């Protein structure tokens, strides 16, 4: 059951969605609304224009970048789905901007607009290998500087490439190749439970 505050949030979200569609419809190619959260789908080339407008416009005023999330859909051509989550403190809107890339397309850094993006984009590059153009300090943040590869990609080996361990006999850290090699993985995208659903 909806209480009155949820109805107001939903009504505000509807008004903002109408405003958004009228103003920035040339930048977006998809729209999805869930209660008081709006998700739009954009091209990577239009991203900076749209986010600059949404931050500086007095109606939208998305002044807080809460998080950047990446999903690796290895079966798609544009396998990485990047979602930026914004928050409007005044009107209490949650807002998601989604874009798709194959990892080689240009994704512009939003660190000039939102300072919280500095760490988030570094983490995405470290874990997924997606490079952000015009990011000033794109370097490793969660793995070692000599680490090879990006561990959250679906095609990264489960055991990694090297084994790092402390050798008590020589009192130092050793790096050795992984002794148990993993065979090439083939991904099955079929779901055995699909036959029970319509």
Protein language model features and the residues they cover:
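Terminal low-complexity/charged segments
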Residues: 1-198
């Amino acid at each position: 059951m909806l209480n009155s505050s949820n109805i107001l949030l939903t009504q505000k979200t509807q008004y903002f969605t109408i405003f958004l569609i009228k103003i920035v419809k040339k930048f977006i190619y998809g729209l999805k609304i869930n209660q008081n959260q709006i998700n739009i789908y954009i091209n990577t080339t239009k991203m900076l224009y749209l986010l600059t407008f949404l931050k500086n416009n007095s109606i939208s005023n998305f002044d807080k970048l809460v998080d950047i999330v990446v999903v690796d859909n290895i079966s798609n051509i544009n396998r990485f789905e990047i979602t930026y989550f914004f928050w409007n403190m005044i009107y209490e809107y949650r807002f998601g901007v989604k874009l798709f890339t194959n990892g080689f397309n240009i994704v512009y850094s939003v660190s000039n607009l939102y300072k919280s993006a500095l760490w988030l984009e570094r983490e995405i590059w470290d874990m997924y290998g997606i490079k952000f153009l015009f990011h000033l300090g794109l370097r490793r943040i969660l793995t070692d500087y000599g680490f090879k590869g990006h561990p959250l990609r679906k095609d990264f080996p489960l055991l990694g490439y090297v084994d790092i361990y402390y050798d008590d006999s020589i009192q130092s850290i050793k790096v050795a190749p992984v002794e148990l090699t993993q065979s090439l993985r083939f991904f099955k995208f079929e779901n055995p439970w699909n036959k029970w659903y319509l």
